[in-house]
Every structure is written in C-alpha cells, then in structure tokens.
Amino acid sequence: MAALSLKGVRKSYDGAQYVLHGIDVDIADGEFVVLVGPSGCGKSTLLRMIAGLETVTEGEIAIGGRVVNTLEPKDRDIAMVFQNYALYPHMTVAQNMGYGLKIRGVERALIDARVQAAAQILELGPLLARRPRELSGGQRQRVAMGRAIVREPSVFLFDEPLSNLDAKLRVQMRLEIQRLHARLATTSVYVTHDQIEAMTLAQRVIVMNRGYAEQIGAPVDVYEKPATTFVASFIGSPAMNLLHGRLSEDGAAFDIADGPRLPVAGAAGAGREIAPGREWILGVRPEHMTPLPGAALATLAVDSCELLGADNLAHGRWGVHDVAVRLPHAMRPARGETLPVALPAQHLHFFDPATGKRAG
C-alpha cells in the first residue's frame, strides 16, 4: 500500500489546449477516492495518467513517495480493473487470475496461493475451473477484480468497472467493492459517471468538470455544501433546484425572474456573506422542500407527480424554472393542484450568477 500524490498535473495533446488543468490532490495510504463527472470531463484521462497509459504534460505523479511520470505501467506497482473485464476466453478463471503473475515469472506455488486467497475473498472458489463464457456478468467482473488482487499492488485503479452490469448487479458489486476495500485497505482510485457509485463508495469524491477538479471532499460535504452550481446540479438525484432571481433589500424575500416572490427570511443570516438587493442563484434540494411545521412556505402548481415507491416527486414551474419537490409516499398531489412547499433557511444555498461559486 502507498499514498498517491498529484501535483499540478496537466494534460495537452497538441501543446496548445489543455484537457486537464492543474490537478492537485494527496490521496492517503489506504484511502478510497472516486473521480466522478460527465463524459469528457477528464476523469478517465487522469486515471490513465496515474496508470502510465497516458503521458504527463506538466506536473508530478508520485506513488509511495516515488515520482512515476516516466515509469512504464508495469513498474508503477498498480493494478487496474476495466469496464470490459478483459478476460482471456480460452483460460479458466484460475488461469485468468494468475496470468499476470505467470508472465512476471512468479513461482507457481505462490501464484496458486494468491489465486486461492483472492478466490476466497471474492467467493470464486467453486468457479475456478470455469471459463468466462460460463460466467455471469457479475462473476466476470469479480474475476477481473481477483486478477488485480493477486498482484498485491500499492494502488488499485478502477475504470468504470460496473458500467456493463444491470441495476441489480451494480448494487451487489458496489457492496462487494466496499467489503473488498474494508478487508484489503489498499489505496484506490475509482472512475465513474454514476453519482450513486461515487457517493456510496468514496471516502472522498473529486468532482470533475471540463478538466478541472470542481470540488474535492467527503461525499456528505459535497452533497450538503456544493462549491458551485455545477456540483449542485450534478450531485444529487434529482438535482438541486437552481433559481435565478434577486434577493430583496431586507433579505427576507427572493424574487424569481418571471416568477413568484419566495419567503427566505433568515437565509442570508450572520456570517453567510450574502448581500441583499442583488442577483443570486438560489439553490434548494427537492427533499428540503417537503412542507414542515414552522418553515417558510411558498406554493407550487403541480404539473405532474412521479411515484417512486418509498416517496413521490412532484414537478411544477416557477417562472422559467422547472422545480421538483420530494414528498412522502402518502402525499401524491394531482395535476393542477396547488402544493405548499417549504423553504427552510438552513437548507437554502446562494451562488454567484457570474462565477457559479457558492456564497457563505
């Protein structure tokens, strides 16, 4: 195991435009960090640079205190789990898991011991004699993980390993990856576009956007205190409601552009540096708009209501803005019904319209 450090890491393919812009992060020994973001944000490129599959244009990558910028992937003491499993179809599960060690010249007895140990961790013992075509998608992914485990690397790298699995299997594999990390405590970097994977697996999340690390923090902090409107809209399902408007001079009301006036008394309170009498983007998550006793209330004309099982999601509009409100299962307003919604001051977020950055 080893710490992983990225200092001012930048990437350019043509020497003119950068696809990664000065990534700085220190990942502790044994920490599980998730790179999350939409397609084209640079997360997979950054992972490939850590692995040695892409060159570093500027900056420094160090594993265990050793700078690895110029080292080949095989010399970095890393193991990678891919989206597409990359199993040899003519080999058994045991042969697939041990092949990397075999081509490195590791003794057969040690290979067998490591394969058996990994198979026990991943519950693959009864499958060791099978070939990939005889396995389910989840089993194949466990074999791919086992192949990485037998390497006993300093760092695990996961490149969207669950993307090919159905929803039920993704949940199962998330739990298995959590258990695996709890048992091995190996430094891990995991790439995904799925925010649920990011929130459930990570000790820290790096939210990527257009080649920048938009926010780095614990999942709960990223969710509760998004640094920018991008993070607020990307993390959370459904996304945070973001409303453009103007805070009144006394700070007690928020006038939505082409929409209603909302009561927000106390939201711009002491220490939040939210100036009244100017334009802001007001953010509030759907689950915080459920009517509660004592909360400031507004009204929303319901356009539709989605039944999600444990709860419901009501939709409407304030001016040009689509608004979603999460409701308990027993509340299912009909189309056209007027719904009272809460705007609790402690759950209101203000963002600068010019920069998109969080205030206070």
From Swiss-Prot:
Annotated ATP binding sites: 37-44
The gene coding this protein: ugpC
Gene Ontology terms: cellular component: ATP-binding cassette (ABC) transporter complex, substrate-binding subunit-containing
Record's catalysed reaction(s): sn-glycerol 3-phosphate(out) + ATP + H2O = sn-glycerol 3-phosphate(in) + ADP + phosphate + H(+)
Gene3D superfamilies: 2.40.50.100, Nucleic acid-binding proteins, P-loop containing nucleotide triphosphate hydrolases
Pfam families linked to this entry: ABC_tran, OB_MalK
Places the protein is found: Cell inner membrane
Protein name as catalogued: sn-glycerol-3-phosphate import ATP-binding protein UgpC
Family affiliation: Belongs to the ABC transporter superfamily. sn-glycerol-3-phosphate importer (TC 3.A.1.1.3) family.
Keywords per UniProt: ATP-binding, Cell inner membrane, Cell membrane, Membrane, Nucleotide-binding, Sugar transport, Translocase, Transport
Function field: Part of the ABC transporter complex UgpBAEC involved in sn-glycerol-3-phosphate (G3P) import. Responsible for energy coupling to the transport system.
Source organism per UniProt: Burkholderia thailandensis (strain ATCC 700388 / DSM 13276 / CCUG 48851 / CIP 106301 / E264)
Top-level enzyme category: translocase
InterPro entries reported for this sequence: AAA+_ATPase, ABC_transporter-like_ATP-bd, ABC_transporter-like_CS, ABC_transpr_MalK-like, ABC_transpr_MalK/UgpC-like, Mo/tungstate-bd_C_term_dom, NA-bd_OB-fold, OB_MalK-like
GO biological process, one term: glycerophosphodiester transmembrane transport
